[in-house]
Design a protein with these regions (language model features):
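Active-site signature of cysteine proteases
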Residues: 205-314
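Bacterial N-terminal signal peptides that target proteins for export
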Residues: 3-27
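Active-site nucleophile-adjacent alpha helix/oxyanion-hole segment immediately C-terminal to the catalytic cysteine
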Residues: 45-184, 237-245, 282
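Non-catalytic membrane-recruitment/adaptor modules and adjacent regulatory linkers
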Residues: 157-205, 219-224, 244-250, 282-289, ...
């Protein structure tokens, strides 16, 4: 009997181990399905995303958030990491600040947070810790002037206390250059408001392509409006399978009489979320400066304000 009991014990152990293995495989499968579902849900804006806010928050909560270093002498760790948490909990909260030329970087930030929030947080943490870091194979080694300025910007609204966003906007402006920056390449105090931080259309296209790793196509220019007969129909079609950003003159919108404006230049980048039309009234819903906005204008005014239509592959 003793001899016969040993095989049954071995058989029980075998089946027990086999069951545990199967349960682990089932659990792992459910975990993969859960994460895949999270990414599908999070990817409503982009068809393919790299990471989710949940993954980014888990990483953020796992790191030391009290460390200081000499690379960024004016960055306060509590304000820096609180700002990163805000970016993850409210991805549309990025605020370029009053009177700055950061609006293009704000639009780019919205897109980055839709596609790779974990990459953003890891990049910012490494940049803070080491003074340099790479995002999507783009190496950032900020100048000393920029590193000293981050955390000191004042009278910019809530940007004053958002030290991560100050750092992010400044290093983007320091890294990417266009013809508007040719004579303002080196940062000096107050340059967040000058041509040093300005972004022309080609520079914006290049930033989006490099940071998101996706194809970008634009129509229009910095001075001449796009050769599009019916902007409304064009935008509706583009929104069907692309992410769309607009390069506009938003000062026109605030004029009482649009017909009196004879000359204008583009001043602002927005992320278009939807566009509808009832008779001659066109309603745009878009993101800019930390929130969604709705604007109702005529077809004539729509054509007048748009200088660039940027189509980004999902």
């Amino acid at each position: 009997m003793e001899f016969e009991s040993k095989p049954s014990g071995l058989i029980f152990a075998y089946y027990s181990n086999s069951l545990r293995t199967q349960l682990k495989l089932i659990s792992f499968t459910f975990l993969l399905l859960f994460l895949a579902n999270q990414k599908i849900f999070a990817g409503e804006f982009f068809g393919e995303i790299i990471s989710t806010n949940e993954e980014a928050l888990a990483f953020l909560n796992s790191i030391d958030q009290k460390k200081e270093n000499s690379f960024w002498p004016n960055i306060k760790p509590d304000l820096f990491y609180d700002n990163l948490k805000l970016n993850l909990e409210k991805p549309g909260s990025f605020y370029p600040g009053r009177s700055t030329n950061f609006c293009a970087y704000g639009a780019l930030s919205y897109l980055v947070m839709q596609k790779d929030p974990l990459g953003y947080v890891k990049f910012m943490n490494e940049l803070y810790e080491k003074g340099s870091a790479s995002f999507n194979n783009n190496l950032f080694k900020p100048s000393k002037g920029v590193m000293k300025a981050a955390g000191t910007l004042k009278f910019k609204g809530v940007l004053d206390i958002r030290h991560a966003e100050q750092m992010w906007f400044l290093v983007l402006a320091d890294k990417f250059k266009g013809y508007l920056n040719l004579f303002h390449k080196k940062f000096k105090e107050g340059d967040e408001n000058t041509f040093w931080a300005a972004t022309n259309l080609a520079k914006f296209d290049r930033m989006v392509s490099k940071m998101l790793g996706t194809h970008v196509k634009a129509v229009g220019s910095d001075l001449i409006k796009p050769w599009v007969k019916d902007p409304y129909s064009y935008l509706v079609k583009r929104l069907g399978n692309k992410v769309v950003s607009l390069y506009i003159n938003n000062q026109i919108i605030h004029k009482k009489n649009h017909d009196k404006i004879k000359f204008s230049i583009p001043t602002h980048y927005i992320i278009l979320k939807s566009i509808t039309r009832v008779d001659d009234k066109i309603t745009l819903r878009y993101w800019d400066y930390g929130s969604d906005t709705e604007m109702q204008i005529s077809a004539k005014t729509l054509k007048k304000i748009i200088f660039g239509i940027i189509s980004i592959d999902k």
